[in-house]
């Protein structure tokens, strides 16, 4: 347990930050999984729709500071390659 007022504040901030990061990390995994599943099923329309949602969500995470810009671009690029491979 924290003994100083500033340490108590840091503990509160850490809890909030951890919850926020857990939310974004879970969301990132789920939207990525949705695109990959649609691509694996060969459903081009569903994969394109999932890719649009993923692109928007991933770049929103950049603006919130959860992931870096280059990381987001790499993830979206790899998902787009996967979707474009569907015959």
UniProtKB/Swiss-Prot annotation:
<dbReference type="InterPro" id="IPR036510">
    <property type="entry name" value="Ribosomal_bS20_sf"/>
</dbReference>
<keyword id="KW-0687">Ribonucleoprotein</keyword>
<keyword id="KW-0699">rRNA-binding</keyword>
<dbReference type="Pfam" id="PF01649">
    <property type="entry name" value="Ribosomal_S20p"/>
</dbReference>
<dbReference type="InterPro" id="IPR002583">
    <property type="entry name" value="Ribosomal_bS20"/>
</dbReference>
<dbReference type="GO" id="GO:0015935">
    <property type="term" value="C:small ribosomal subunit"/>
</dbReference>
<feature type="region of interest" description="Disordered">
    <location>
        <begin position="1"/>
        <end position="21"/>
    </location>
</feature>
<keyword id="KW-0689">Ribosomal protein</keyword>
<comment type="similarity">
    <text>Belongs to the bacterial ribosomal protein bS20 family.</text>
</comment>
<protein>
    <recommendedName>
        <fullName>Small ribosomal subunit protein bS20</fullName>
    </recommendedName>
</protein>
<keyword id="KW-0694">RNA-binding</keyword>
<dbReference type="GO" id="GO:0003735">
    <property type="term" value="F:structural constituent of ribosome"/>
</dbReference>
<dbReference type="GO" id="GO:0006412">
    <property type="term" value="P:translation"/>
</dbReference>
<dbReference type="GO" id="GO:0005829">
    <property type="term" value="C:cytosol"/>
</dbReference>
<comment type="function">
    <text>Binds directly to 16S ribosomal RNA.</text>
</comment>
<dbReference type="GO" id="GO:0070181">
    <property type="term" value="F:small ribosomal subunit rRNA binding"/>
</dbReference>
